Amino acid sequence: MAAQPQAPSAGGRPRAGKAVKSVARPAKLSRESIVEGALTFLDREGWDSLTINALATQLGTKGPSLYNHVDSLEDLRRAVRIRVIDDIITMLNRVGAGRARDDAVLVMAGAYRSYAHHHPGRYSAFTRMPLGGDDPEYTAATRGAAAPVIAVLSSYGLDGEQAFYAALEFWSALHGFVLLEMTGVMDDIDTDAVFTDMVLRLAAGMERRTTHGGTAST
């Protein structure tokens, strides 16, 4: 039996900080600097706390100053979501480069898990995105989030709708695991071992899906 590839370390779960510090005020406000400030704000305060006035306070300015660069809170949140999606896509493409099948799946899953724990606010923004909608740019970004995984699934012989559904199933499993970790449900369990086992079982299911014509056997 071939040796199983080793899962990367998730880098551990960071402990909550003692106090929230203000984000340094940008030398000059721009849409990009506001989005950057919002990303830092998210990890410190959380998605539900993100408002124009709260972010402006963290940036050392007033709310009206931000409206010179963003149209509304929803415009800001949309820009943040798209930025987070782009960052995750870049990360998955980087760690998965040159890898295939179980090796790629394990490495990408580990990177996804690590990102969620080290950037909880950004991860929350990512998982609140709809998969469709009336905004072409946003819809394209959300669909693009599955692209790195779909590319890896092609090494199992999956493509088209079959690969897209498999990617959604894979994402659902990772998201569920990460949420359980974040809520502390599995604090007394060797989560690294459980995570590796889960990902390898998912990979085996992809293999069976190809063998059995699109349906993973049980």
Curated annotation (Swiss-Prot):
Gene Ontology MF, one: transcription cis-regulatory region binding
HTH tetR-type domain boundaries: 28-88
A GO cellular-component term linked to this record: plasma membrane
Domain of life per record: Bacteria
This protein's UniProt keywords: DNA-binding, Phosphoprotein, Transcription, Transcription regulation
PANTHER family associated with the record: HTH-TYPE TRANSCRIPTIONAL REGULATOR RUTR, TRANSCRIPTIONAL REGULATORY PROTEIN
Name the record gives this protein: Uncharacterized HTH-type transcriptional regulator Rv0681
Originating species: Mycobacterium tuberculosis (strain ATCC 25618 / H37Rv)
